[in-house]
Design a protein with these regions (language model features):
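Class II aminoacyl-tRNA synthetase catalytic cores and aaRS-like
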Residues: 1-527
Length: 527
């Protein structure tokens, strides 16, 4: 045994418990056993696939419930089970342990008796095994005297020695620790594992709905020479191979539209985007979006797609209602449409139109305690006033539409000539969940808008888009009329994947923050 294998490493936060566990690891190695074996092997060195705890329970729990097996019964069925030790009780000649394995956190009791495993093996169990260790056990399926399905162990082996103690749920796992060390959260909290499964179910459902409509999933570049597709501040990096400054994508829009120009007429992508902006309970620097584009569709078709996606996800999770501090969200009712200018006018008691001067809007902002930038023009002021005054009041699903043109430089002018654009934001529970446009495909107007954006960028606006000549070149080849949709996947999960009331199945009573929905969110380094 090499000194390197047996030496205790220098760990900055070494505790007495960790030191004891390292000594147990050393004893395992000194005795010729492995603390971290490659797997469970037979005498000839062949791999033995462990039996899943869930499968053992699925076979025998119904027999217990039906009375075919009762307390004290034994079977001749020998199983090989692997799991993490989450409970242990050692007595004289009989030891008990709960083993946990699988995404569902399935558990089964292991019983080690002097008669079955022998004196030395039982002594080793008592002296070498701690909470948090992974172990292999081989033995017969039995029912304990207390009526609990168990494995009467005849042989055990270490699968992975835990050096750090398992956390105590309420003592060691505050909210900050749960987010920073998600592996601990997953280890001890079933709710954390359940949220991971719900997230996976939601993304599968989104894909299914789109693919049922003939969409094809694409993968587009994360590193970009020109940032665009949204108004947001990008992360900047440098490609050494080309000695070229680049940015991380803030949206997937422009490459997906290029694909539609090329003839892939229904496309989507679910992927991470990166925005170098604020961090709070609803915003993360990196987050997951869905974007999809459909030739010969418009904002109304995309509204149908959005509603179908969200309702399908709710149905998969069994969600029928979502309770908030402001009331109950009903996804099954009518999804309303609210035009920006009339909606804001009603909220402030003053008629606001595209002709309302910026000075009047600043006076309204001051009256309603809305902070504004003196450099903002009238369109920007309308957008901010609506977002601060009206948006938080929209509880049930509402498509907010007829925005001023500067809100979305990639949306087409409204067909009714109202000096607005064909774009909507979906607001649910006072929060934007997604957006869609009738896409701007006129390359002349698009060049004008992106040129205006590039001038803002050159003047120091970090959120303005840059002029993407290749995207404009694609539009100049002729893009079909199309609708486009963007959905914040994390915010959809926040809406639907919260804890449900056990007394009222289907009613979500607590919505998680964005840091809970992202498995490993970006966190400020610990001091």
């Amino acid at each position: 045994l090499s000194n390197e294998q047996n030496a205790a490493p220098a760990i900055a936060d070494m505790s007495d418990q960790m030191q004891i566990r390292l000594e147990k690891r050393a004893k395992l190695l000194e005795s010729g056993r492995q603390a971290y074996p490659v797997g469970l092997l037979d005498a000839q060195g062949g791999r033995i696939a462990p039996d899943h705890i869930a499968d053992v329970r699925a076979e025998y729990d119904p027999k217990l419930e039906a009375g075919e097996l009762t307390a004290g019964d034994e079977t001749d069925h020998v199983v090989n089970v692997a799991g993490r030790v989450v409970f242990v009780r050692n007595t004289g000649k009989l030891c008990f342990a709960s083993l946990q394995a699988g995404t569902n956190g399935d558990r089964i009791q292991a019983m080690l008796s002097f008669n079955e495993v022998g004196e030395q093996s039982l002594a080793d169990w008592k002296s070498l095994v701690d909470l948090g260790d992974h172990v292999y056990v081989t033995g017969r399926v039995v029912v304990s005297r207390r009526g609990e399905l168990s494995i009467m162990v005849r042989e055990w082996r270490m699968a992975a020695k835990s050096i750090r103690p398992m956390p105590v749920l309420h003592k060691d796992l505050n909210e900050e620790t749960r987010v920073r060390r998600r592996y601990l959260d997953l280890m001890v909290r079933p709710e954390a594992r359940e949220l991971v499964k719900k997230r996976a179910l939601i993304t599968r459902t989104v894909r299914r709905v789109l693919e049922d409509h003939g969409y094809i999933e694409l993968e587009t570049p994360v590193l970009q020479l020109v940032h665009g597709g949204a108004t947001a501040r990008p992360f900047r990096t440098h490609l050494n191979a080309f000695d070229q400054p680049m940015t991380m994508r803030i949206a997937t829009e422009l490459p997906l539209k290029r694909a539609v120009v090329g003839g892939i007429e229904r496309v989507y992508e679910i992927g991470r985007v990166f925005r170098n902006e604020g961090v709070d309970s609803t915003h993360s620097p990196e987050f997951t979006t869905l974007e999809c584009y459909e030739a010969y569709a418009d904002q109304y078709v995309m509204a149908e797609r959005m509603q179908e996606i969200i309702v399908a996800c709710a149905q998969e999770l069994g969600v029928t209602a979502i309770e908030t501090e402001d009331g109950t969200i009903d996804l099954g009712g009518e999804w309303a449409w609210l035009s920006v200018y009339p909606g804001l006018s009603e909220a402030v008691g003053v008629e606001i139109t595209p002709d309302t001067p910026a000075e009047t809007l600043r006076e309204i902002a001051a009256k309603h305690d809305v902070e504004v930038n003196p450099a903002w023009d009238a369109e920007k002021l309308v957008i901010e006033l609506f977002g601060e005054i009206v948006e938080p009041t929209l509880l049930n699903p509402t498509f907010v539409y007829n925005y001023p043109p500067s809100a979305q430089p990639l949306a087409r002018p409204n067909r009714d000539g109202s000096r607005t654009i064909e774009a909507w934001d979906l607001i649910i529970g006072g929060m934007e969940r997604g957006t869609a446009f009738s896409e701007l495909i006129d390359p002349v107007i698009q060049r004008e808008r992106l040129t205006e954006q590039s001038h803002k960028a050159a003047a120091g606006d970090d959120e303005a888009m840059e002029l993407d000549e290749d995207f404009l070149r694609a539009l100049e080849h002729g893009a079909p009329p199309m609708g486009g949709l963007g959905l914040g996947v994390d915010r959809l999960i926040m809406l639907l994947a919260g804890e449900q009331d056990p007394e009222r199945p289907g009613t979500v009573v607590r919505q998680p923050g964005i840091r809970e929905t992202i498995l490993f969110p970006l966190m400020k380094p610990e001091a």
